[in-house]
Amino acid sequence: MWVGVISLFPEMFRSVTDFGVTSQAIKKGLLSIETWNPRDFTHDKHRTVDDRPYGGGPGMLMMVQPLRDAITAAREASPGKTKVIYLSPQGRTLNQAGVEELATNENLILICGRYEGVDERIIQSEVDEEWSIGDFVLTGGELPAMTLIDSVSRFVPGVLGDFASAEEDSFADGLLDCPHYTRPEVLDGKEVPSVLKSGNHKDIARWRMKQSLGRTWLRRPELLGNLALTDEQELLLAEFVREERQNSK
């Protein structure tokens, strides 16, 4: 996967390129990240990239010309058909389904806004999709872009040592993840559930599904409304709910 990033602060992306799973993916040649700074496309000595909005109001907007030229440069560098994304609070909220959808693209250009945003005509003429990471305000699009890169790159074949890790993560099947345990077997008097030490893979899978369903019911019940549970899942959830209510008495 190739990702081009348009940002006034390209140095921020070293946290993605130099560390963690994404860094390893780059070293393996599975992921490529290039950055373009609109300041490099200005024509004045101050390298101006912002201007006042028509109609007045607080704040500034990113100027059209440097931003458009940076996008053009990124398009020209892209190895193939490219989807251009603007990270924006007005965009579609990123969730696991959206991550998997974006992961089907081989090439992405991510535009990171600053100040009060960008000229609407840039969005209309240059942007294919707008995406948001939530209903809250940030100072720029860099952190959302890094979030998108991190989550999407997990679905690039070979990036994770075990692709099942991505498929079994929270939200991958619409549910929250089940609890996980490692050594020591007893910690502060609390033991690892015996089923996980049984070696019975069928029982372990059943326990994990039950816990996943139960945790979703407890913490994010609205997610269950979007799912068509199997008969077995319905039974497991009912069993969890019954036990939870008995334990709370």
Curated annotation (Swiss-Prot):
Enzyme class per UniProt: transferase
Keyword Methyltransferase: yes
GO cellular component, one term: cytosol
Domain of life (superkingdom): Bacteria
InterPro entries for this protein: Alpha/beta_knot_MTases, tRNA_m1G_MeTrfase_C_sf, tRNA_m1G_MeTrfase_TrmD, tRNA_m1G_MTases_N, tRNA_MeTrfase_TRMD/TRM10
UniProt EC number: 2.1.1.228
One Pfam family this sequence matches: tRNA_m1G_MT
Subcellular location, principal: cytoplasm
Single GO MF descriptor: tRNA (guanine(37)-N1)-methyltransferase activity
Cysteine pairings via disulfide bonds: none
Example GO BP: tRNA N1-guanine methylation
Catalyzed chemical reaction(s): guanosine(37) in tRNA + S-adenosyl-L-methionine = N(1)-methylguanosine(37) in tRNA + S-adenosyl-L-homocysteine + H(+)
Function recorded in the entry: Specifically methylates guanosine-37 in various tRNAs.
PANTHER family: TRNA (GUANINE-N(1)-)-METHYLTRANSFERASE (PTHR46417:SF1)
Subunit structure: Homodimer.
Family annotation (NCBIfam families): PRK00026.1, trmD
Family that this chain belongs to: Belongs to the RNA methyltransferase TrmD family.
Name of the protein: tRNA (guanine-N(1)-)-methyltransferase
UniProt gene name: trmD
